[in-house]
Amino acid sequence: MARIFLTGGSGFVGSHVLPALLAAGHQVVALVRNEKAAERLRVRHAAAPGALETRLGDVVDAASLRGAVDGCDAIVHLVALPRDWNGGADLERVNAGGTANLVAAAQAAGIRRFVHLGALGVLERDGLHYASSKARGEATVRASGLDWTILKPSLIWGERDGFFNIVAALVRVPAPIVPVPGDGKSRFQPVWVGDVARAVVQVLGDPKSAGRSYELGGPRYWTHREITEEVARALGKRRLVLPMPVPLIRLVAGLSEAVRFPFPVATDQLRQLAFDNIGAVDGVERELGFVPVDMGGRLGYLRRKISKQ
């Protein structure tokens, strides 16, 4: 099997992709930023001795990548920053710049195979720093001349996720109302993190996937309002979901950013939530040959996390 260089192996998606790669018989070289993260990975995957190696580095440090990728057959790039408090500069540095650094390292090392985790619906839009930075990262991969494959998921759900835990935090607030930006009708296609990991392993082993992008979404669409209601049900909370004007929520979020108060959602994310984030409802089954898991009734992990606090 192949020797895979993996970024983001200690993150939410990576914590599912890494064991999936090991289970498929691959050797994994995981990029980590410090020795503490390396030790956590080694302990977590102690049952696979010899199959996991860690190397220190950072995607924003081009020099650290040059030797780190040596000896690998393929690269799986998962690292992405979802938001920042720096006007988009950090998003650009990680999502666009970090991807460019890794592509350059692959080219220099002669590594042809490159699987990149993009995002569904990202375009270069004025004021949408996350979407623009991810779009520029994807453009770099497409223009690389490598045997690339891009996976573009909608919202990803699963234990340790970002978005659904943020919604859960809002639902946990002891108030009868949970605000959603705009009219609450923006549509999403939540996809289970286990299905994302399955897709990574599948395309990695399929030469025909080179030069292609795949949209990853669940088997049905959910509005923002429906997602919030589903989270409330999972937590056993009775809440009224109240649409609120985006400018009002952006004002509150903007004030929190100005004083560095950790408001759950950055203003950039609020703008992004105004757009639909969906692909073909049968896209995964048609393109990858498996039926993705439906999110409905499966958010119990949010309650379990609360019970540990």
Locations of the language-model features?
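Conserved Rossmann-fold NAD(P)-dependent oxidoreductase catalytic core, especially the SDR/UDP-sugar
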Residues: 81, 89-144, 149-151
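A conserved pocket-lining segment of Rossmann-fold NAD(P)-dependent short-chain dehydrogenase/reductase
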Residues: 169-191, 195, 199-203, 207-210, ...
